Each structure stands twice: as C-alpha cells, then as structure tokens.
Design a protein with these regions (language model features):
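Glycine-rich, low-complexity intrinsically disordered segments
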Residues: 2-399
Length: 399
C-alpha cells in the first residue's frame, strides 16, 4: 500500500494495480468462460466418446453408442403434476337429505359452513338451481327446478372439479399396467414351442385406487366421503332417489372421473395424461378418528384420510383425454368455450401465475400440450391493481 500524493489516502502499489488490471480483463472472472471455451468443451466431449453435448439426445435416437462411453442425457425429471376429481351429480335436495339423519347437517343455511360446501360440491345441479349449464347460482332459468338453490361461498359453482381433494391429495396408488395375454402351443418332440399375442392390451376391467388425503382443519374430507358413500348406499337401498333425468338416462349419479396430469419441471406442459373410465369411493378411514389413547393429547391417527376408490377402465396417453378434459371444464363454465373464452377470460403468462394461485380455470392446448390457466378479466384487473402491477409490461398478455 502507498499514500496517494494528490489525495493523501492510502492506495494500491504499481504491482497491485497491474494485478487488478489483469483481473478486470480476465474473461473467466468477468464472463465465466473464455471465447473458445465452447470449442474446447466440445473437443473434450468428442475425444471422450460422448459426442456433442448439445446434441446428446438427438445422437441417442439416431445412432448406436458403440464405444460404451456413457450417456450425458439428463434423467427424466417430470413432476407428479395434478390430480383432478370431477364432481358427481348427487341429488342432495331437501326432500332427499331429510330422509336420513346423518345427512341433515347439510341443510345448514350458512353459505360458508363445511356441510353447505360439501352439499354444493357433490350436487352441482342443486347448487345452481337445477341448471347444470346455466348462469350464476340462484338465478332461475327456463325449465329449471323451482326448488331453492344451495350454493356455497367456499365452492366455485363454475368449476368442474372438487378442488379440496386436488389440493390435499397426499398419495394415490393402484393404477394398473397394461398386460397382454399370450397363447403358447403344446411342446413338440424336442420341447419346441411357439407363442403369440392372444389378448387385448386395453384396460377395461375394474381395479382399486388407494388414496390418502391431508386431513385439514374442520375435517371436511372425511365428511365429504362419508356423505358420498352413504348416499350411494341409500340410493341402492331405495331410501334416496336420484334426479329424474339420471333415472331416465339410466346413469349412475355417484360416479366421478379421476384425471392424472404429469407435468414438466416448470409445471407448464403436460407430459403424460391418464384417466379412469369412472370411479366411486368404497371405504373411508373415519373410524380412526374415534381411536383413543391417553399417551398423547392429539390423535395422530387422524392426520390423513384414507379412501379406496373402485375404478373401471384405465386410459393412458390417449389424445381424446385432452378433448374430454376441456369439454368437462366447458360443461360447468360455458364461457370457457373456444368461441367465447377470450372475450371473458385472460390467459395467464408464467410470470403472473404465482399471483393467481387458487384462481382460474384449466385448459390443455391440444397442439402444444400446455396446461393453460385462464382468469376472468375482472379478477385479473383487481389482483394486478392490488399488487401494483396493473401497468406491468414485463411480458405481453394473452387476450
């Protein structure tokens, strides 16, 4: 160190100044690489038998790794993604639920109560005044039932899915693997045999899905499945009646469809998709909540709710699932139809999605497999205004 003659302050010596100057011009320190770094890396990769790193995936498809030098392609890193449960169509009208005492709590007049929310989830028709494809809840339309609607402030009447199940699903197991039967001939003199495919690889049989849900405050999931299973049993017994249109069309009203969407690491694109034909809950671990032990204050057995579903048919990687998923969304919210969606909703760009978590309606682009989220223009203006980003131009917005 030396004293600067002009300022009188300590400064660097000539040697130190030279070192600092060299550091300022060091491309590795400033840019993280040298101008020919890419070429050097490529040369090392080629000499080692790995091929060009930037085209490793292409090379694996095109040719044979005859040097056995290893494969630099990264492993698949798909996320578990999302699981959607479509809403069934139970008949939880006043005349029905008054026939069984265990269903009576759903007569609650409080729109923010859990029993009222369960009633709205499981009976979307009644929650919208008998109009499954109509306007806002509580607004009568031509031909709609004259009974009083029972919407809930905790349930989006225009959503086709049971959100509380999607948001609290911990695990799901039991999806079957495709399997093909074979025929094998009788053995010959030298025990020679021949074999061939002798069956179908499609999955049309029944199977069980085991699910576990996080038991959140108020225990709404246990009550939801309790009502669901009790209703199905009481309909079979003849105590409760399905809606007339379900009887006429010979449909089962307590069934749901489970969609499984495997997403990429950014949760932007659907990598794989599956669904069962239909499913319905069979059992629920409600008994565990009544276990007792004086060793602990809180019942740890009730941390999760276990539910077994009976499913029929498994559909994997079928493009028709994209259309059926989108059609299901439109069935509950006609404004999401391709002809009207852009006049009512705004597609969220990735940079804005965290602001609108828990808000919006999904759509899968059939060409790019992007999982889009659309929010109403009113919600968009409100939330962007509340966060001070209304005039944000970070990215152009889809209109």
């Amino acid at each position: 160190m030396a004293i600067d003659e002009k300022t009188g302050f300590l400064g660097v010596t000539g040697d130190q100044a030279q070192i600092a100057s060299e550091e300022d011009h060091d491309p590795i320190l400033n840019n993280g690489s040298t101008p020919d770094a890419a070429g050097l890396i490529q040369s090392v990769s080629l000499r080692s038998g790995y091929g060009q790193l930037k085209s490793a995936a292409t090379a694996a498809f095109f040719g044979i790794n005859h040097r056995g030098a290893g494969n630099p392609i990264p492993l698949n890193t798909d996320q578990y993604g999302l699981t959607f449960f479509t809403r069934p169509r139970l008949n939880l009208s006043y005349d029905n639920i008054t026939r069984d005492r265990t269903l009576a709590p759903m007569m609650s007049m409080r729109r923010d109560s859990i029993p009222r929310a369960i009633r709205a989830y499981l009976d979307p028709v009644g929650a919208r005044l008998g109009n499954p494809f109509g306007g806002p809840a509580g607004v009568a339309v031509a031909g709609a039932a004259s009974t009083t609607a029972y919407p809930s402030t905790l349930v989006d009447d225009q959503s086709a899915f049971i959100s509380v199940l999607t948001n609290n699903l911990v695990s799901m197991t039991g999806w079957p693997d495709p399997y093909t039967d074979t025929y094998t001939s009788k053995s010959g003199l030298y025990k020679e045999e021949w074999t061939m495919i002798d069956g179908i690889a499609k999955i049309y049989n029944k199977f069980s899905l085991s699910t576990n849900f996080r038991n959140i405050v108020g225990d709404p999931i246990s009550y939801l499945f309790y009502v669901w299973t009790q209703y199905a049993s009481l309909v079979h017994e003849g105590v409760l009646d399905p809606r007339p249109e379900m009887v006429i069309e010979n449909e089962i009203d307590y069934q749901t469809r489970i969609y499984r969407l495997i997403l990429d690491p950014t949760r932007t694109y659907v990598q794989k998709m599956a669904a069962c034909g239909v499913a319905f809950p069979l059992s629920i671990s409600i008994g565990a909540s009544f276990n007792y032990s004086d060793d602990k204050t809180f019942n740890a057995d009730n941390d999760q709710v276990s539910v077994e579903f009976q499913a029929m048919g498994a559909i994997y990687m079928d493009p028709i699932l994209i259309k059926e998923f989108n059609d299901t969304v439109v069935m509950f919210n006609q404004a999401m139809h391709d002809s009207t969606r852009r006049s009512t909703y705004i597609k969220l760009e990735s940079v804005y999605k965290p602001l609108f978590n828990y808000i919006g309606y999904p759509r899968i682009d059939p060409f790019t497999m992007e999982l889009e989220w659309w929010v109403s223009k009113g919600d968009f203006q409100t939330i962007m205004g509340d966060t001070g980003l209304l005039g944000d131009t970070v990215r152009p917005l889809s209109k």
